Amino acid sequence: MHNLDTLYISDLDGTLLTPECKVSDETASALNTMIANGLFFTVATARSASSAAPLLEKLNLRLPVILMNGVVIYDMEKREPVSVCPIEPEAARAALAIFERHHIAPFYNRLNQNTLEVCFTQLKPEANRKYYESRKNAPDKHFTMVNHLTVTNDMPSLLSLIHI
């Protein structure tokens, strides 16, 4: 049926998910059968754990998932990162300086143990406000409005830009 030395990776949005942002019962059944028979399957997405986890509940994923465009490798069963590849503090500071020069307000993500801390200075443009409103109650993501985005050396830095 399939090659047992091949890893299959699917995106979520626009690929695995329906237009309603769900994994269909048919897709879940087919994938779970293939996974039970030895298929190496996982997903890669720009989403964070708090956004991806509810969408993947129907799947019996045995492999870690790739989150935040490859920044985080995450174990869905243990609900914890396996690997994090943060931005170096100097690079994060340089990126924030560029955003500030161009009057762009990004979300600045820091990983504090298993919690994603999302700092921001304002909820403009409208896309930033919508992003915040749709995710502000996520269990493993905490939003904090700050006067100034500051990079610290004690927590991995992850930048995300929601700006349309």
Residues covered by each model-derived region:
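Short loop/turn microsegments at loop-to-beta-strand junctions
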Residues: L4-T6, L61
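Short loop/turn elements that form and flank the Walker-type P-loop nucleotide-binding site
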Residues: N3-L4, N37
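Acidic, His- and aromatic-enriched active-site or binding-groove loops in soluble protein domains
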Residues: K124-L149
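Asp-based phosphoryl-transfer active-site loop
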Residues: T6-P19
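Active-site phosphate-binding/coordination module
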Residues: D25-E133
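Residue-level recognition of oxygen-bearing side chains
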Residues: K22
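Conserved small/polar residues in nucleotide/adenosyl-binding loops
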Residues: I162-I164
